[in-house]
Amino acid sequence: MWQAISRLLSEQLGEGEIELRNELPGGEVHAAWHLRYAGHDFFVKCDERELLPGFTAEADQLELLSRSKTVTVPKVWAVGADRDYSFLVMDYLPPRPLDAHSAFILGQQIARLHQWSDQPQFGLDFDNALSTTPQPNTWQRRWSTFFAEQRIGWQLELAAEKGIAFGNIDAIVEHIQQRLASHQPQPSLLHGDLWSGNCALGPDGPYIFDPACYWGDRECDLAMLPLHTEQPPQIYDGYQSVSPLPADFLERQPVYQLYTLLNRARLFGGQHLVIAQQSLDRLLAA
């Protein structure tokens, strides 16, 4: 794998050699390395060869976010595979937690991301993943249909396959669709998994990574913030300073949070199952 990475980097940086290769802690999904090649520092994710499509999708999403020129993301240098392993090579940006100032700036940047480009439909040109969960993104013109079916219904079906039952799937999907029926927002490019673990302060300001992008309601990104008390509230303040949210957005917030709560429940079980069921019960009773 390292020979393949060196070859791809040499095509962009000229001949060099690997000067440093340290495995990083916390690689819960993929192995992660800090690599120095020809004086440049890189962050390398690697896994089994069969997982190359996931790395390709992640690279495509980072490049899509970069094209918006609104947010900072790690530059992608290489994505590929050898006989045994697949890998994704990006800039190495030593992460620090966001402070109040950088959180405010990030909020402004996210607001501008949501304003970028015109897209008439909801979805994405390819499917991707929320953490390790496959995420479908088939294009759909009605937001209520897209979110009810491809977000909530999809999570409920995956849970059912694992033996986890939250209720009648068709009835829940219909309820969610009705809750959103009168809400048809302008599609915005979303990060899709905007929690504190995917935001950091780098050498040149805040940056985001590990996206789960799609074109959706901008409120979905903001709905993540209250789920993470460690996320600085200034992100929300910065966002509001550029693109104020509608007065009724809090009515939809628990609907959008349910997607993440169901995903956590299926992945981690335990108390997450209780939290997701309670959230769903409150929505159905409203």
Swiss-Prot record:
InterPro entries from the UniProt entry: Fructo-/Ketosamine-3-kinase (IPR016477), Kinase-like_dom_sf (IPR011009)
Molecular function as annotated in GO: ATP binding; kinase activity
Gene3D superfamilies to which the protein is assigned, alphabetical: 3.90.1200.10, Phosphorylase Kinase, domain 1 (3.30.200.20)
EC number: 2.7.1.-
Residue numbers annotated as active site: D193 (proton acceptor)
Family to which this protein belongs: Belongs to the fructosamine kinase family.
Name by which UniProt lists this protein: Probable ketoamine kinase YniA
Protein's organism: Escherichia coli (strain K12)
The organism's taxonomic lineage, starting at the top: Bacteria, Pseudomonadati, Pseudomonadota, Gammaproteobacteria, Enterobacterales
